[in-house]
Every structure is written in structure tokens, then in C-alpha cells.
């Protein structure tokens, strides 16, 4: 299929586990001569007539503990939860012309004292299920599917939550000569807790096009895109109304001589009820690899807020369906009416071990607008007043013990600034550990 190219060797296959499991191609292991590990014969089976069936899955166990989530504005006190997620999938292909991908999921959680969000629990259900038809570099996909676009600032799978984000709909993808172009019309999956009862959220829709250039002679690559969003019920500090939003964006990213960069700009127009939308964001992630194991980084973001509520124009940026958590594992803030500066350092003392530390300084972009909690919830008591939201300091470790086994941990300490203290905000902590096994 045009959406995934077969790796050159079985060993490369084993290093090629991907966040989007449909991006993997294990057909090399259908050749008995390339099977070198005990379960290789199970991983890929020749089903005759030029067709193959590959199997895979992931088991993740994650523990979280939090004190005063979202600066104590969501709840006060301490809470903890154990999250269990099991994913299994089958990938049947008839060469590169026809493909059927099916992924089932079981997501469970212990009971939180503050109440479990909808993204915690779902009995066995269809996580993904789609049909691909491929001709040359063009692939047409229809069905339920996960999606990551570019940096994930606007559309991503939301892997931190127990239930990853998926969409129902169609996508056309073209890959040729280093170009990647996608056109899509999708609606988010509506999560329901019982078995096989997840439907389509018809109150929302996402459509548009996304293109990525080939590498450009030492200056990186460029994404450019248009994304449309409809929400029958959009909620902002300015009120609740039908939202029709158009996002026009560009992203420049790459690395050279120890320097890496990822810079993205988006402008938004549309309608929010009777009001017109005029919003924007500018985001950057810059890094300098001082020595082989050490990277110094700086993230800086501005997501516009609403300067004058009631003036007939909504200025609050909407990040659509972004990666969450967005800044740290504590999932403290949504990228709306926000200015953020996050210096950090990353150390890789061993090839598969990454240690990181950062501090994130947060301000409201517009005083008159609210502070927005994830995913995009305005906290009414934070309208007006000061800009200083507060800070969060993060320590994290990511150890890929083997290509199949990954251990992760994070600690975040956060404290409110004047704008949040005035609304009753408090300091808090977040701790997370997880183990994930892919197969």
C-alpha cells in the first residue's frame, strides 16, 4: 500500500514498531528464511493466492497519581488510577492493491475518586477497521482509523489517554517522489462504555487537505494544509454556539549540523453562532545537540485569545483534535488563549534511554478571555484579572528496553500564578509510570 513501505530486513521490521500500527509492514517475515526469532512464524502467514495476514498487538499498563488536577480547578485533593489497555490487530493484504486492517481494543480502569472521564473505560470494541484500495502511489481508505498529521498540534491520536482517538470516514493519500498529500473527511468516534457500541459522533466533522514536501536541500521540509471543523456545540468563554472553523497552516521542520527545528503557524476564520472567528497560533520547538548525548531545547507557543468578548468576533484559537497531553504528562492546560515558554534539556546516556527535564511558564494571551483546561474547557472564574497562569516543572524517563518493551515515567510539579490563584487555584503534583509491550 502507498501508506506504508516494506522495510529492508526482518531485523529492521523488529525495530519498526510504530505508534500508528497500520504504518508497519511485516510481510518480510512471511518468508521462512527471514524468521530468526521464536514468534516470527506467527507474526506473518502466507494465506495463498498472493495474500498475507500479519498479526500484532500492544499491552499497556499505566499508573497515575495526581494532587489538585488542573491547579485544583477540576478537583481538590489526591487521586490515583490504574489504566489497562489491550490492543490486537490483523492486517490482511492482497499485494499492494487491497488491504483490510482490523484492530480490537479492551480499555479498563480502576475507579477514580474524582470520577472517571469518558476516555478511561470502554469494553471490547472496534478501535480501527478500514479497507484500503491502492493504485500506484494513490491509496483510498474508508472506515474507522487513527490519524496523526504533522507535529500532532492539531490532529493526533491522544496516546496519553487510555482510549486513543479515532475517526470514521474516508481518506485519500498520495505518495510519490518524496511528496505526501492527504485529503480527508472524518468524524470522531463517539465512545460508549459497553461492548461493541462505539458509534460516530455526527455532531462534529473534520475535513481538508495536508501536504508534505520532500526534503529540501539542507533546509528541511515544509507542511502546508487546510483543515475544516464543524461542531454543533462549541463552548468558549464567549458562550455556546454552532462552530464552523477553517484553519490554514504551514510548518517548517528539519535538522542540520546538530540543530533541529519545528515551527508552525496557523490562522483561523469562520463563524461561531452569529460571530465571526479570527484566531491564530504560532508554535516552535527548537533544539541544539551540544554533544552526542545532550540536547538543549526551547519550546515557545502563542495561541490567541478573545480580546473583547461580545464585539462580534471570537479570537480564541481552537487546536481541533490535538495530541494530549499537550505540554507535559500532567495534561494541565489546553492550547487556547495561551502564551508558553518551555526550556528543557534531554540526555540520552544510552541508545535506548532518554531522560528529560523542563520548566514551562504559562500566561494568558488575553486578559478578558478565560484559562482553558483540556480538552477545551473554559474556566469561567478565570476571565479578566491577571495574565500569569503559573508554571509546571517536569522530569521524565523513557527506556526502550527492547524493541518490544518500553518503560516510561514522569513527575510534574505545578503551581498557580495570580490569574489562577484568584479563581481558587492551588499547587499540585502528577506522577505517571507505564509499561508497554508491543508484538
What is the predicted function of each stretch?
Residues 65-84, 94-138, 149-157, 194, ...:
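Surface-exposed loop and membrane-interface regions of Gram-negative outer-membrane beta-barrel proteins
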Residues 54-64, 101-105, 141-145, 182-186, ...:
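Transmembrane beta-strands of outer-membrane beta-barrel proteins
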Residues 402-434, 438:
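Predominantly the C-terminal beta-signal and adjacent terminal strand-loop region
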Residues 15-28, 353, 395, 399, ...:
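Outer-membrane beta-barrel "beta-signal"
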Residues 12-34, 237-238, 264-268, 275-383:
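Extracellular/periplasmic loop regions
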Residues 72-76, 117-122, 158-162, 198-202, ...:
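Flexible, surface-exposed loop regions and adjacent strand-edge segments
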Residues 3, 7-79, 118, 295-300, ...:
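N-terminal periplasmic/intermembrane-space "pro-region" immediately following the signal or transit peptide
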Residues 136-140, 153-310, 348, 368, ...:
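Signature for the C-terminal beta-barrel architecture of outer-membrane proteins
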Amino acid at each position: 500500500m502507498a501508506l506504508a513501505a516494506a522495510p529492508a530486513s526482518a531485523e529492521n521490521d523488529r525495530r519498526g514498531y510504530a505508534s500508528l500500527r497500520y504504518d508497519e509492514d511485516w510481510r518480510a517475515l512471511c518468508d521462512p528464511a527471514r524468521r530468526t526469532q521464536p514468534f516470527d512464524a506467527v507474526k506473518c502467514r502466507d494465506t495463498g493466492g498472493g495474500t498475507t495476514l500479519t498479526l500484532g498487538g500492544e499491552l499497556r499498563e499505566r499508573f497515575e497519581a495526581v494532587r489538585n488536577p488542573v491547579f485544583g480547578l477540576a478537583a481538590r485533593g489526591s487521586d490515583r488510577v490504574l489504566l489497562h489497555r489491550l490492543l490486537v490487530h490483523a492486517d490482511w493484504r492482497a499485494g499492494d492493491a487491497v488491504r483490510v486492517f482490523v484492530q480490537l481494543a479492551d480499555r479498563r480502569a480502576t475507579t477514580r475518586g474524582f470520577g472517571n472521564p469518558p476516555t478511561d473505560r470502554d469494553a471490547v470494541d472496534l478501535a480501527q477497521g478500514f479497507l484500503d484500495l491502492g493504485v500506484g502511489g494513490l491509496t483510498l481508505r474508508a472506515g474507522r482509523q487513527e490519524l496523526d498529521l504533522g507535529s500532532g498540534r492539531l490532529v493526533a491520536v491522544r496516546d496519553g489517554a487510555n482510549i486513543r482517538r479515532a475517526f470514521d470516514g474516508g481518506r485519500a493519500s498520495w505518495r510519490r517522489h518524496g511528496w505526501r498529500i492527504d485529503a480527508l473527511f472524518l468524524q470522531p468516534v463517539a465512545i460508549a462504555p459497553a461492548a461493541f457500541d462505539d458509534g460516530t459522533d455526527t455532531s462534529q466533522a473534520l475535513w481538508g487537505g495536508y501536504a508534505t514536501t520532500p526534503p529540501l536541500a539542507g533546509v528541511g521540509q515544509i507542511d502546508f494544509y487546510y483543515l475544516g471543523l464543524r461542531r454543533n456545540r462549541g463552548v468558549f468563554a464567549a458562550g455556546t454556539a454552532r462552530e464552523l472553523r477553517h484553519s490554514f497552516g504551514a510548518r517548517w521542520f528539519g535538522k542540520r549540523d546538530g540543530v533541529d527545528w519545528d515551527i508552525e503557524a496557523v490562522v483561523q476564520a469562520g463563524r461561531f453562532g452569529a460571530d465571526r472567528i479570527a484566531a491564530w497560533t504560532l508554535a516552535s520547538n527548537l533544539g541544539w545537540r551540544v554533544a552526542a548525548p545532550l540536547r538543549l531545547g526551547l519550546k515557545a507557543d502563542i495561541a490567541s485569545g478573545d480580546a473583547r468578548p461580545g464585539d462580534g468576533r471570537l479570537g480564541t484559537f481552537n487546536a481541533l483534535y490535538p495530541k494530549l497531553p499537550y505540554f507535559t504528562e500532567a495534561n494541565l492546560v489546553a492550547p487556547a488563549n495561551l502564551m508558553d515558554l518551555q526550556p528543557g534539556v534531554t540526555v540520552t546516556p544510552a541508545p535506548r534511554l532518554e531522560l528529560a527535564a523542563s520548566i514551562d511558564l504559562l500566561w494568558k494571551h488575553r486578559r478578558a478571555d478565560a484559562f482553558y483546561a483540556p480538552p477545551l474547557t473554559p474556566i469561567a472564574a478565570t476571565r479578566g484579572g491577571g495574565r500569569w497562569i503559573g508554571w509546571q516543572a517536569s522530569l521524565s524517563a523513557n527506556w526502550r528496553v527492547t524493541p518490544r518493551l518500553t518503560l516510561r515515567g514522569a513527575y510534574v510539579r505545578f503551581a498557580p500564578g495570580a490569574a489562577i490563584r484568584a479563581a481558587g487555584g492551588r499547587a499540585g503534583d502528577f506522577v505517571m509510570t507505564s509499561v508497554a509491550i508491543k508484538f
